Structure formats: C-alpha cells, structure tokens
C-alpha cells in the first residue's frame, strides 16, 4: 500500500531508503549521505509547468555537510552532480508515490545548465520538479524538467530528466 501524502519528513524519506514507505515493491530512495533532501514539501498529480505533476523538496545546508570537506579543499562547493542526482531521486520518488514498483534508475537528461553554486554559507536548497509525462506500461518511466534554487535564487535547470522503474536490474 502506497503512503500517499502531499509532504514527507526526513524520517519518512529515510524510511523510503529502507523500502518501508511505498511497500516492498516500491522504489527506495538512496540512504545516508546520498539522500539529497531533508523534506518533500509538496507533491501533486497535477500542477507544475506542464500540469502533469509537481514535486518540491528542500535540503538544509550547513558547513558540516560531507561534500564540503572534500569538494574542494579550501574552496568548498556542493558538487553540481549531487543537485542533478537529487532531481533524479525526486522523479523516482514520485513514480513510487503514484504506485509504481521496481528499482529506480536514472535514464538520462536532455540538457543541464549550471548558473550558480551552493556554498557552505547558504541556508537552503529547493528542488522543483515539473512532470511532462509518466508512462505506466511494462516500463514505468517519468519525464520531467527540474530546477534547483539556493536561498531562492535559480542556479541549475535540467530539461527532460528521465527515470525508469525496473523489476529486474541484472541486465541493466
């Protein structure tokens, strides 16, 4: 049974990483340091730029986050690939929220632009995912556009984020 709410806490997201939120067949989020959000504040089946679904989530920033110590020494910045991964994570989370089953895998992105950075002095990163299409056949796949904001300023955009859910990933 899918635990379908409009918002989720960090505890809920950690439960997803253990496979407890969307049931045994639902796609888990990454756990530990690779979980790139602290809360989901909005999920809808409509809304967003394309009126086909919307997710908004947040990550609290503090100088003690693991990546600031190593990327880069003396010039700490959140790796842009982690923001991109967060957007893929949210596409997969949405597919599980809709009742999709399987293991989530990022399938690509059409275009990514970085126009800013996340520094340890920032307070909050906001992720916004605007769904364009969800395919629910043998393959369950989400197609979406995403935005990353730091303290309200748009710093990354991604067009055509693709995530699929797979029952068997052995041949992937």
From Swiss-Prot:
GO cellular component, one term: cytoplasm
Organism, as annotated: Edwardsiella ictaluri (strain 93-146)
The keyword Membrane is assigned to this record: no
Active site: 71
Principal cellular location given in the protein's record: cytoplasm
GO biological process: one example: unsaturated fatty acid biosynthetic process
Subcellular location: Cytoplasm
Protein name: 3-hydroxydecanoyl-[acyl-carrier-protein] dehydratase
Catalyses which reaction(s): a (3R)-hydroxyacyl-[ACP] = a (2E)-enoyl-[ACP] + H2O; (3R)-hydroxydecanoyl-[ACP] = (2E)-decenoyl-[ACP] + H2O; (2E)-decenoyl-[ACP] = (3Z)-decenoyl-[ACP]
GO MF annotations, alphabetized: (3R)-hydroxyacyl-[acyl-carrier-protein] dehydratase activity; trans-2-decenoyl-acyl-carrier-protein isomerase activity
Functional summary from the UniProt entry: Necessary for the introduction of cis unsaturation into fatty acids. Catalyzes the dehydration of (3R)-3-hydroxydecanoyl-ACP to E-(2)-decenoyl-ACP and then its isomerization to Z-(3)-decenoyl-ACP. Can catalyze the dehydratase reaction for beta-hydroxyacyl-ACPs with saturated chain lengths up to 16:0, being most active on intermediate chain length.
Pathway: Lipid metabolism; fatty acid biosynthesis
Database matches in HAMAP family: FabA (MF_00405)
Subunit structure: Homodimer.
Pfam families noted in UniProt: FabA (PF07977)
Family, as annotated: Belongs to the thioester dehydratase family. FabA subfamily.
Keywords: Cytoplasm, Fatty acid biosynthesis, Fatty acid metabolism, Isomerase, Lipid biosynthesis, Lipid metabolism, Lyase
The protein's Enzyme Commission number: 4.2.1.59, 5.3.3.14
């Amino acid at each position: 049974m899918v635990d379908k709410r409009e918002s989720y806490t960090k505890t809920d997201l950690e439960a997803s990483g253990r496979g407890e939120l969307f049931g045994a067949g639902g796609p888990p989020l990454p756990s530990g340091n690779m979980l790139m959000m602290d809360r989901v504040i909005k999920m809808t089946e409509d809304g967003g730029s394309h009126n086909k679904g919307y997710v908004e989530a947040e990550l609290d920033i503090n100088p003690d986050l693991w990546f600031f110590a190593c990327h880069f020494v003396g010039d700490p910045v959140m790796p842009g690939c982690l923001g991109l991964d967060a957007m893929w994570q949210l596409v997969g989370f949405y597919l599980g929220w809709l009742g999709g089953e399987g293991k989530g895998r990022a399938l690509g992105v059409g275009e990514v632009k970085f126009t800013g950075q996340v520094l340890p002095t920032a307070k909050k990163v906001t992720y916004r995912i605007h769904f364009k299409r969800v395919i629910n056949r043998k393959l369950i796949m989400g197609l979406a556009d995403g935005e990353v904001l730091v303290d309200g300023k748009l710093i990354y955009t991604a067009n055509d984020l693709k995530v699929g859910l797979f029952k068997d990933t052995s041949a992937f």
